[in-house]
Amino acid sequence: MAETEALSKLREDFRMQNKSVFILGASGETGRVLLKEILEQGLFSKVTLIGRRKLTFDEEAYKNVNQEVVDFEKLDDYASAFQGHDVGFCCLGTTRGKAGAEGFARVDRDYVLKSAELAKAGGCKHFNLLSSKGADKSSNFLYLQVKGEVEAKVEELKFDRYSVFRPGVXLCDRQESRPGEWLVRKFFGSLPDSWASGHSVPVVTVVRAMLNNVVRPRDKQMELLENKAIHDLGKAHGSLKP
């Protein structure tokens, strides 16, 4: 499809399909902003959060958000939580510093993969995975290796549509402080846009890229969006090319 379509028209057409969505990792920075944008855009008829604890919201806009509390160590016991969703967004993730090497791999690979398997079995058609710039299953760095491994494993599940997002350093104000991240964000925030955009990206831009992508017609089963593509798609306002 060569011609561009108005983004507003794509969103409206998508809303008319009354699709349901689940979010994994809604308590994290990206998941939190993603939920906010989903509700503001009104793209889905049903929104479900799947997590290890119930989240508390004061705003009226969140009153119809469904929540499924699961034990990620026993996900097979919670298969019903993953049933009946058209679209899924996975923003699960921790760090080696917080969870240790084994704990990091457990969350970022094992939990993500098992969740994807249950989502596929439950009827999910479009699975969106938040990964990382430089993800490579052959990498010597554990973080990038695990990210690359889970990307490949989820692809093997053969979702009707599978979108992988590889942002650079996420520019945000975390509710949870991680040592060194403030300094990194400050560094990238002071660089010229042309250089910083190749290595960093605001969380809200990542989220908007995810949602702009979900409403546009797919042109292939597996989509891999690197940092520059995330910037371009996340800043689109008027039109999109599929």
Curated annotation (Swiss-Prot):
Give the binding site residues for NADPH.
S27, G28, E29, T30, R52, R53, L92, G93, Y143, K147, R178
Instruction: Give positions of region: Required for interaction with elongation factor EEF1A1.
Output: 2-25
Keyword Zinc attributed: no
Q: Name one GO biological process term.
A: cell differentiation
Localized where? Cytoplasm
Q: Which residue positions does N-acetylalanine occur at?
A: A2
Can you name one GO molecular function term for this protein? NAD binding
Q: Which residues form the active site?
A: Y143, K147
Provide a GO CC annotation, any one.
nuclear envelope
Give the keywords, sorted.
Acetylation, Cytoplasm, Disulfide bond, NADP, Translation regulation, Tumor suppressor
Nucleotide-binding recorded as keyword = no
Function (record text): Represses translation by preventing reactivation of elongation factor eEF1A. May also inhibit nuclear import by competing with nuclear import substrates for binding to a subset of nuclear transport receptors. Has additionally been proposed to act as a redox sensor involved in cellular oxidative stress surveillance.
Q: What is said about its interaction partners and assembly?
A: Monomer. Forms homodimers during oxidative stress. Interacts (via N-terminus) with elongation factor EEF1A1 (via middle-region); the interaction is direct and competes with EEF1A1 binding to guanyl-nucleotide exchange factor EEF1B2, thereby inhibiting GDP for GTP exchange and reactivation of EEF1A1. Interacts with nuclear transport receptors XPO4, IPO5/RANBP5, IPO7, IPO9 and KPNB1 as well as GCN1L1/GCN1 and LRPPRC probably through their HEAT repeats. Binds NCOA5/CIA.
Q: What is this protein called?
A: Protein HTATIP2
Which species is listed as the source? Pan paniscus
The gene from which this protein is expressed is HTATIP2
